């Protein structure tokens, strides 16, 4: 089986809340490891993540240990970064055996082709400020300045504050199926350019939803909390099903 999850936002909220969310996520990793051939983490697993040459953020040891355990057992884990953890470098790969991917990824399961993306920087051509911020935060120059000029304690505190500010700015928004339309439109355009693709799978929107139309399925993964999370599972034939974990 193939499993997909996103938007756990480990480290969000106060320490007890973050710890409960992490334990919930680790229980899910335990459960799916029973029959998983591969696990795809589709961005924003961490609320903020930044790596220096010798320094990584404090915490998340249960998650990191579990990921290392799973890859040691031969389970493939692929981490497609999101807008909150785009500055991942090689730590997760070297220490935990996780394959880190900074762009979208296309896989084939059976006769179906599935395109996987976090979804944060798609279909934003009419939003110049968002495009500018996206380019800036993904800039290698900014990453090097951040890592070379700012002490890790200050950098991580700032990053956690910024991530929390960004998340809270959307906290009162009501997400509906209509909120997903810009990514549905993107998926339709992608299908036209890549007719072999049968399904697109996104995170980012914090709203689990499955949209199906002729020759195209679109799955949105949803997010995680202290006691539950949504995820997708696919068999070897590429059939996608959204599920809830408690």
Annotate each language-model stretch with its function.
Residues 1-3, 107-115, 212-218:
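Beta-strand-turn-beta hairpins that frame and shape the catalytic cleft
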Residues 35, 73, 110-112, 196, ...:
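Residue-level preference for short coil/turn positions at secondary-structure junctions
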Residues 47-70, 157, 165-200:
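N-terminal short leaders/motifs
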């Amino acid at each position: 089986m193939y499993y997909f999850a996103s938007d756990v936002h480990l480290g969000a909220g106060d320490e007890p809340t973050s710890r409960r969310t992490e334990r919930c996520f680790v229980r899910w990793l335990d459960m799916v490891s029973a029959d998983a051939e591969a696990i795809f983490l589709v961005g924003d697993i961490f609320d903020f993540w930044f790596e220096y040459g010798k320094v990584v953020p404090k915490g998340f040891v249960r998650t990191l240990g579990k990921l290392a355990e799973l890859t040691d057992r031969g389970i493939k884990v692929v981490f497609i970064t999101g807008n909150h953890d785009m500055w991942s470098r090689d730590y997760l790969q070297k220490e935990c055996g996780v394959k880190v991917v900074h762009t979208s990824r296309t896989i084939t399961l059976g006769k179906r082709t599935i395109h996987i993306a976090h979804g944060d920087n798609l279909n934003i051509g009419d939003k110049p400020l968002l495009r500018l911020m996206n380019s800036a935060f993904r800039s290698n120059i900014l990453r090097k300045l951040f890592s070379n000029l700012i002490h890790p304690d200050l950098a991580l505190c700032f990053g956690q504050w910024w991530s929390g500010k960004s998340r809270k700015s959307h906290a009162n928004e009501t997400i509906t199926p209509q909120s997903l339309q810009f990514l549905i439109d993107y998926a339709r355009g992608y299908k036209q350019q890549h007719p072999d693709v049968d399904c697109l799978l996104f995170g980012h929107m914090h709203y689990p939803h499955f949209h199906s139309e002729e020759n195209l399925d679109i799955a949105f993964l949803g997010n995680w909390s202290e006691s539950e999370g949504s995820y997708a599972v696919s068999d070897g034939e590429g059939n996608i099903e959204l599920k809830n974990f408690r």
